[in-house]
Amino acid sequence: MIRSIRHSLSMLLSLAALALVPASPAVTQAAEAATRMELPAPNKTGGMPLMQALNARRSTKTNYSGAALSAQQLSDLLWATWGANREDGRRTAPTAMNRQDVRVYVALENGVWQYDAGHALIKVLDGDWRGQMGGGSLTLLYAIPQANEWGGAHVGSLYQNAGLYSASAGLGNFVHVSGLHALDGKLPLPEGWKVYIIQTVGLLK
């Protein structure tokens, strides 16, 4: 009887010890890779001259191929939209008093990701939600505090940046509210925040 109890205690202690063993670096890195996507450095030179991009900018609601953007195109699009363009962390789009109180989420085939100022994507939701939000290669979701009276103006600066990049890169884009509430309650938004508007971007047929 005593021997059986000792054996059981020994097994429990062994299991507890295994539970305390930290995951190997390879396992930890694999888990981080599944939830964080480092983007290639954005290409900040070249492209279409500004006046030509303004002339080419338009809304394209149909004729998307559904193919994914390249990693470089995705990087350039997000940097143009809301990337840091100065060492002090200021962005490509202005906000009143530099509050930077806008979040950009990207709905891709492999989930919904939040754009991080360090030029990376952080996964916040699994699944392909693009079909509920206009299709295309991806959909950008712009979230702001509901109490911010300037939030709409801030978002407008961002989606204009995205639209001009799309024109320069030969991509289609359109700003809309179709499927605006598809992810209500699913995104890790701070209290009092909401998705204000969305923008579909994609390769054309």
Could you tell me what each predicted segment is?
Residues E109, A117, A143-Q146, V201:
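Fold-independent oxyanion-binding glycine-rich loops
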Residues L18-V27:
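C-terminal segment of classical bacterial N-terminal signal peptides
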Residues L69, G83-N85, G111, Q146-N148, ...:
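Solvent-exposed loop/turn segments at secondary-structure junctions
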Residues R57, L77, V104, L138-K186, ...:
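Small-aliphatic-rich amphipathic alpha-helix that forms the alpha element of a beta-alpha
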